[in-house]
A protein has these predicted regions:
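Active-site-adjacent segment of SDR/Rossmann-fold oxidoreductases
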Residues: 29, 128, 168-178
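Substrate-binding pocket helix/loop in short-chain dehydrogenase/reductase
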Residues: 98-99, 106-108
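SDR active-site lid
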Residues: 175-250
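Active-site helix of classical SDR
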Residues: 122, 158
């Protein structure tokens, strides 16, 4: 999609962080943007900030882990703008910790927001993008943790799922004139560590109190420091805009974890090398 100007974009998790950065970049490129978030006060503030720049934006509150609310948000977008060309599945939560700390509520919340909402967004908005025949683009936010695993297992599983979904969807939708990109950010200055502020009551118990000692305490310190020195969300937004315009399959924010990804694929190749030359028993 070389020309974003005049197109309509729907962005989830748009009240702050990466979502607001993406919405800002698209609006500055001339797109009409529907902002969607669960955090209503912050959502209205974001809309006001963008309207102050003469951007054509509106907002709709939705809990994307509820398919019905996401569908209602799509209907509100069509009522407001008539068409949708760009879908940005960006809403996300931090997720649970390592083995031994999991809860059913934690898995349900993490998968509901980080993965199921992406699937539902595509199910709901895909036909709307197809319907006008003008082409479009879908961006889904995974994470660098969707390519290399850490200690937040539920989070990793959800983000690996977004990568796999995006890769498969890209092949499916290319003949229909719809591009697909997966955003895999590493450290970005966001408030993801305070995701629990928006925890719906039905997921009570999903977030455990942080440990103040041991490996998890050190991990939290490392992540906190990484986020503090991370990329500006507005910079990430510009990368996403460029990725949409040039149909990038993968959008990264820096090269900090490149060697870790290379090491993972080297380990996978070693697995093949161990059996190379053997004849499978049929």
């Amino acid at each position: 999609m070389k020309d974003i100007a005049g197109k309509t974009a729907f962005v989830t998790g748009a009240a702050s962080g990466i979502g607001l950065g993406i919405a800002t970049a698209l609006a500055q490129a001339g797109a009409k943007v529907m902002l969607c978030d669960i955090e209503e006060a912050a959502l209205k503030t974001a809309r006001a900030q963008l309207e102050a720049t003469n951007a054509d934006v509106d907002c709709v509150r939705a809990d994307v882990s509820l398919k019905g609310e996401l569908k209602a948000a799509a209907e509100a977008t069509i009522a407001r703008y008539g068409k949708v060309h760009i879908l940005v599945n960006n809403a996300g939560v931090g997720g649970s910790g390592p083995y031994g700390t999991w809860t059913d509520a934690g898995w349900a919340w993490t998968m509901g927001v980080n993965l199921h909402a992406v699937v539902w967004g595509i199910e709901i908005f895909g036909p709307l993008i197809e319907s006008h025949g003008e082409g479009g683009h879908i961006v889904s936010t995974a994470s660098i943790a969707g390519l290399i695993s850490g200690n937040s297992i539920a989070y990793n599983v959800s983000k690996y799922g977004v990568v796999a979904l995006s890769e498969g969807l890209r092949n499916d939708l290319a003949p229909r004139g719809i591009g697909v990109s997966v955003l895999c950010p590493s450290f970005v200055r966001t408030n993801i560590l305070s995701s629990a502020r928006n925890l719906p009551p039905r997921f009570a118990g999903a977030v455990q109190p942080p440990r103040t000692d041991g490996p998890m305490s050190q991990r939290l310190k490392t992540v906190t420091e990484g986020l503090a020195r991370g990329a500006d969300p507005r910079y990430v937004g510009e990368l996403v805009r460029e990725g949409i315009e040039n149909d990038w399959p993968y959008i990264f924010t820096d090269t900090e974890f490149e060697r870790h990804i290379e090491a993972r694929f080297a380990a996978i190749k070693q697995g093949f090398d161990r059996i190379r030359g053997r004849t499978p028993v049929r």
